[in-house]
Design a protein with these regions (language model features):
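Conserved RNA-binding domains used in RNP assembly and mRNA/RNA metabolism
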Residues: 2-82
Length: 82
């Protein structure tokens, strides 16, 4: 398969709809997330990944599952998994 697997650490925007004290707001940070997936594409704006795939029996084409599009500005690190 031509796709390479990566461990990607990224910051996920986080929201809060309730009231926060000033201290809570000051300490309010995005969540740091980790994903291990195949990189489908990567450019200056986005990295598109998928974690599972299959070949459609009717068409013979690949189909992808557990797909994500991550803005590159949110990515802290990407490391290729051997």
């Amino acid at each position: 398969m031509k796709f390479k697997k990566y461990k990607i650490i990224f910051l996920d925007p986080t929201g809060h709809t309730g009231w926060l004290s000033e201290d809570e707001l000051y300490d309010f940070d995005p969540e740091e997330c980790v994903i291990e997936a195949y990189v489908y594409s990567k450019d200056k704006k986005f990295v598109t990944t998928f974690a599972s795939y299959t070949t459609n029996k009717d068409t013979g084409k690949m189909e992808f599952g557990d797909a994500n599009v991550i803005p590159t500005a949110c990515i802290k690190s990407m490391r290729k998994i051997k």
